[in-house]
């Protein structure tokens, strides 16, 4: 157990963001003693991060870390994501770089539908891949992906786009919004395409908060698969549903309690409160049951959260152990929550 308040705050930051202990300690030392460890993004930055999580929500490549994110360094007006780039893919032409290009680079089809982040443009240098929406506040920096991998992925995706009748917006308009993406700078509800973009804004605070804490999911169990999707809510927002398929290693009555404690922690968590927990931790480990945690904003912001803790063990986990080297890498990613952070609150039920 960490002995000082400063160390305990650094411990929370390390578990929540995946940064090293040295980085966490340095960051905490620079903050006022009572400040939040992970700042909330301003509105424009939150929307940018919502597009990022939406694009990565259901990965089309093999990932170990949640959505491939190793660590996060978030500020009010910017975010730096460090991605893994060492996972063998089933298809040789696939890579983490290609997944990011596919998810983030804006392109349009013959019907005017825009995929990716409208208005986003990219630059690369020795400090990473930098993404900004032209004329709007906020930025994303990608680390862990070499510039040459990014360039190769752009070429490969451009070739695939042409076969599907799609075009990158930046090819003909590198320094200004393409006419196809311009309507989504300030989307309305007049068309189905606009509504798709318009509906991201009310719950962007939640998507941003989840992205900023992606590594926290590794405290639940060995990461086997992480996916997400959204449903509309009655308050005009979106319910984010996260399914974290994991192998449980924690020897605790409620193995996900440390995660829910940190997710709602006043210092490092989201501004949410748990509303319900369907807990099946008392079921046999080999059962098909999985626990679910539900939460909503403490400030009445639109949207809701559902986290599904889908357990795999015994025969049900054998699929993920076919490649032993890969499985051992996944086991190494598991971050058990120290006992003093799991016992402060009882499980809901």
Functional labels for PLM-detected ranges:
Residues 1-12, 16-349:
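Compositionally biased accessory segments in Actinobacterial proteins
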